[in-house]
């Protein structure tokens, strides 16, 4: 309302206001960083969706001739989003799923390879005899030197680093059990003092 009274009082102000509003209405340029352009939802003048910039996909799509290796690009114009989806699109998706499905043994082998890649080795299963010998040595010395560990490795047919890890784990187990026994002792003393 204030602008109408201002425009009525000053004709040049109303003319300037019309120029500015006309400029804003006529301005149709869109920013390249708009939400629509980032999401790839921009429409060209003919109504077709603008292809989003995905150079990592473009290289794969052009180099691979096998249609099973091509990953379908999902867009809102895709018929899979509509109730009347065509069979060809469904067939492509099924082929893609079939190609990427793997058996249980393949998954396990891949998991082993992946864990190897991360630096993890398979777990060592110690025999009863090996554990008995290691426990006897641990009772005498919980921190054996390299010479004792190498001798044990030769006798038990194990790698020296496995023996070193066994002793580290055994010391951690002893420390944990010691802590738990102290906790139980304190707990028992506390409960008995409460009962008295």
UniProtKB/Swiss-Prot annotation:
Subcellular location: Nucleus
Superkingdom assignment: Eukaryota
Record feature DNA-binding region, as residue ranges: 119-178
A Gene Ontology molecular function term of the record: RNA polymerase II cis-regulatory region sequence-specific DNA binding
Keywords: Developmental protein, DNA-binding, Homeobox, Nucleus
GO biological process: pituitary gland development; regulation of transcription by RNA polymerase II
Matching SMART domains: HOX
GO cellular component: nucleus
Keyword DNA-binding among UniProt keywords: yes
SUPFAM superfamilies: Homeodomain-like (SSF46689)
Family membership noted in the UniProt record: Belongs to the ANF homeobox family.
Function: May be involved in the early patterning of the most anterior region of the main embryonic body axis.
Name of the protein described by the UniProt record: Homeobox protein ANF-1
Biological classification of the source: Eukaryota, Metazoa, Chordata, Craniata, Vertebrata
């Amino acid at each position: 309302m204030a602008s109408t009274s201002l425009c009525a009082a000053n004709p040049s102000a109303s003319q300037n206001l019309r120029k500015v509003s006309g400029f804003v209405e006529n301005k149709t340029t869109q920013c390249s960083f708009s939400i629509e352009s980032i999401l790839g939802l921009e429409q060209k003048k003919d109504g077709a969706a603008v292809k989003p910039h995905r150079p990592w996909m473009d290289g794969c799509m052009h180099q691979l001739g096998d249609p099973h290796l091509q990953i379908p690009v999902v867009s809102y114009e895709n018929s899979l989003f509509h109730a009347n989806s065509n069979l060809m699109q469904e067939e492509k998706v099924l082929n893609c799923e079939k190609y990427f499905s793997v058996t249980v043994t393949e998954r396990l082998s891949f998991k082993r390879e992946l864990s190897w890649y991360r630096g993890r080795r398979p777990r060592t299963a110690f025999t009863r005899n090996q554990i008995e010998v290691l426990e006897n040595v641990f009772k005498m010395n919980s921190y054996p030197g390299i010479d004792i560990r190498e001798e044990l490795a030769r006798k038990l047919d194990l790698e020296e680093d496995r023996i070193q890890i066994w002793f580290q784990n055994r010391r951690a187990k002893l420390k944990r059990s010691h802590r738990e026994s102290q906790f139980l002792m304190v707990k028992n003393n506390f409960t008995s003092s409460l009962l008295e």
